[in-house]
Amino acid sequence: MPQTDKQICIPPELPELLKQFTKAAIRSQPQDLIQWAAEYFGAMSRGEIPPVRERSERVALSNWAELTPELLKILHSRVGGRLIVQADELAQMWKVLNLPTDLFNSVMNVGRFTEEIEWLKFLALACSSLGVTIAKTLKIVCEVLSSDHDSGPPRIPFSTFQFLYTYIAEVDGEISASHVSRMLNYIEQEVIGPDGLIKVNDFTQNPRVRLE
């Protein structure tokens, strides 16, 4: 095979382009991610505005139930505490709740899930379709994961929050790993009590906690 000295040049703006693409995909939640990606980058190459739709602009079909934290809580209870769930089983649970198929497919595509799905990652991305910011997304996740038997504000183990915040920030792509680390260190050292739990108010009403 003939060799060539030609090198592939990666433009310095590529990482930022991919970050914006990922965020746009989460907001738009296309049913066919490949087709949508082709339209997205095609528009950018022509200097046009990419086909990004905000959640409020998506057409709600009357035969589908609207995704809500309450329905996600039901879905979480049916997962039954498992960390890994099979894609076909989760798809069936989703269908039974009459939730939009395009949203399920979008979460699968954005999360790059295959046959075995990490449930907390799937849940985080599903909640991101409801939350405008990372803080609001984590608030919804916390409410979904919090046990109904607990009195007081919703709360989850700090280790779970740490995993979710790190993952959501990574998918978002606009928050540095160093910022995430600083916030987590502050919360762990200054906020978390002996029970090892974090409450919603700990990261939504504390002026020193800025997740974004």
From Swiss-Prot:
For biological process, the GO terms are:
cilium organization; flagellated sperm motility; protein localization to cilium; regulation of protein phosphorylation; sperm capacitation
* Ranges of residues in domain RIIa: 12-43
Q: Where is this region: Interaction with RHPN1?
A: 209-212
Q: Which residues carry this modification: Phosphoserine?
A: S56
Any one GO CC term of the record = motile cilium
Q: Where in the cell is it found?
A: Cell projection, Cilium, Flagellum
Principal subcellular localization: other
UniProt xrefs under InterPro entries:
ROP_DD
SUPFAM superfamilies the UniProt entry points to? Dimerization-anchoring domain of cAMP-dependent PK regulatory subunit (SSF47391)
Q: How is it modified after translation?
A: Sumoylated, sumoylation decreases upon spermatozoa capacitation conditions.
What does the miscellaneous comment read?
'Ropporin' comes from the Japanese word 'oppo' which means 'tail'.
Present the record's domain note: The RIIa domain mediates interaction with AKAP3.
Tell me the subunit arrangement. Answer: Homodimer. Interacts with AKAP3. May interact with SPA17. Interacts with RHPN1. Interacts with FSCB; the interaction increases upon spermatozoa capacitation conditions. Interacts with CFAP61.
The family assignment reads: Belongs to the ropporin family.
> Main role?
Important for male fertility. With ROPN1L, involved in fibrous sheath integrity and sperm motility, plays a role in PKA-dependent signaling processes required for spermatozoa capacitation.
Q: What is this protein called?
A: Ropporin-1
Species: Bos taurus (Bovine)
Q: What gene name is listed for this protein?
A: ROPN1
